[in-house]
């Protein structure tokens, strides 16, 4: 459910997306606690290969009492824009990277006051340059003071992940192979 708010802001209901079995909840809680230890005080986390898993990890931090900003920074796909059927008019990460001098109101509120979202936005050509990519650090810095945790769904190439304090690679069980996972880590 999407509700239009003042000045073209949107509010989304995340309840259906974050529904998990008890076993899933337990797994995400354990993962969250391990990530906190591994990040060692860092607050910006990238997750590759699984946008919905990234969303659930972000929500797990919310369940632990943190204020979280989820950023759909996987410019090559619009999983969440498509899921919420928001169309192509919503500004997001891609818009900032293309025109960082313009001030956009990118935050999308959810029905949980501790959980906000920034969507991908519109990238007509599907490509960001190295200069635009380097703006991601500035983008992260703009929001890191306002939240306890930033969780980014990163592209599979890890171009965005390199600006984060840590990266999680989430494989589907059917595609996981130890050698391919090691090679992917080396590429990142």
Where would I find each of the regions flagged by the language model?
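Conserved catalytic-core segment of NTP-binding enzymes
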Residues: 2-3, 64, 129-188
